[in-house]
Amino acid sequence: FSTTGFGLQASTTFNVTKKWQVFGQFNYGKGIGSYLNDLSNLNVDIVPDPDNEGKMQVLPMLGWYAGLQYNICPNIFVSGTYSLSRLYSENNYPSDNPEAYRKGQYFVANAFWNVTSNMQVGVEYLRGWRTDFNFSPRHANRLNMLVQYSF
């Protein structure tokens, strides 16, 4: 007996106008946790099958994001993105552990300025939410700043 994972992925980016861009990505599959940001460190690609002792199973999971970018001028832009990652239970795994990760969401807004062709500065705010299988919510906020110089 063996089990097989699979994954589907679609992504896009397109210009709505000269200044507005839309971008996004969608992923769905079984055993694709290493390809999804929130799930990549949870070791859920292949897990025990509680209904079949000594056997393994692959769990269904989903991840997507969508964003919008506005180019203020050729060297300054702002953007916002919403993302969701979701782990589904199969054969009561991992839902039999009420504190196991169920889904995560985040919203991020940022601004970047390409000061020169070699130097970029930016600022970003991120708000993240996590919900476990017991529906217990958690959240966190983060502020990032960047100064990058390429030699």
Give the location of each predicted region.
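Detector for outer-membrane/organellar transmembrane beta-barrel domains
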Residues: 1-97, 101
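Outer-membrane beta-barrel architecture
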Residues: 21, 77, 120, 140-144
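Membrane-embedded beta-strand positions of outer-membrane beta-barrel proteins
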Residues: 24, 66, 80, 109-111, ...
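Solvent-exposed loop/turn segments connecting transmembrane beta-strands
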Residues: 101, 132-137
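A short, acidic, amphipathic alpha-helical segment used as a generic capping/interface helix at domain edges
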Residues: 104-106
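Outer-membrane beta-barrel "beta-signal"
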Residues: 113-115, 139-151
